């Protein structure tokens, strides 16, 4: 710092005192000139310049980092597969240490299989019941037809009892039968003969 004017005033007084006083007084006066702040302007600009220079360096550094990342690209699939394998092995090891959970899984699978088998058995039983009901209905229909035929023809009940022994269904199950489609013949309606003398029937046949 520059000093425009400095004055050093020293006033040293050593008053004459008796011999038993050993004190001395010394006075020094300094006059300092006015302080100028012109030298501080350079510090303000240097702070601003340093801020912008640091920002530019940071931007350039990030630009180079991004260019390197784009050149290398994404991680390879081999690394991803190896990480997945490690994860699976870790999960397998963690699950292997818990036998109770595996027992639960096997028991659940066994329960599901037993339920599926039970449902299949129920479906088969229902199918057999339906087939039996169909056979019963066809037998009842044949009995009704025979009774109507006996009433119209006036035959004795003994012949009806003979026909009742035979339960002939009115349909053929093509799935279980081994015959082809050509072998199946459409059955014609039974011809009911009324109580007529033999001579009349022979005449009709001759005509």
UniProtKB/Swiss-Prot annotation:
Polar residues bias spans = 7-21
User: Region Disordered: start and end of each range?
Assistant: 1-21
Record keywords? Cell membrane, Endoplasmic reticulum, Glycoprotein, Membrane, Phosphoprotein, Transmembrane, Transmembrane helix
This protein's record includes keyword Transmembrane? yes
- One annotated GO biological process: energy homeostasis
Q: Which residues form a coiled coil?
A: none
InterPro entries (alphabetical): MRAP
Source superkingdom: Eukaryota
Q: Where are the transmembrane segments?
A: 47-67
What GO molecular function annotation could you give as one example from this UniProt entry?
type 5 melanocortin receptor binding
* Glycosylation-annotated residues: 11
Membrane topology summary: Single-pass membrane protein
Its cellular-component GO annotations read: endoplasmic reticulum membrane; plasma membrane
Q: Where in the cell is it found?
A: Cell membrane; Endoplasmic reticulum membrane
> What tissue specificity does the UniProt entry give?
Predominantly expressed in the brain, mainly in the pons and cerebellum but also in regions involved in energy homeostasis, such as the hypothalamus and brainstem.
Q: Summarize the protein's role.
A: Modulator of melanocortin receptor 4 (MC4R), a receptor involved in energy homeostasis. Plays a central role in the control of energy homeostasis and body weight regulation by increasing ligand-sensitivity of MC4R and MC4R-mediated generation of cAMP. May also act as a negative regulator of MC2R: competes with MRAP for binding to MC2R and impairs the binding of corticotropin (ACTH) to MC2R. May also regulate activity of other melanocortin receptors (MC1R, MC3R and MC5R); however, additional evidence is required in vivo.
Assembly, in brief, is:
Homodimer and heterodimer. Forms antiparallel homodimers and heterodimers with MRAP. Interacts with MC1R, MC2R, MC3R and MC5R. Interacts with MC4R.
Name assigned to this protein: Melanocortin-2 receptor accessory protein 2
Protein species of origin: Mus musculus
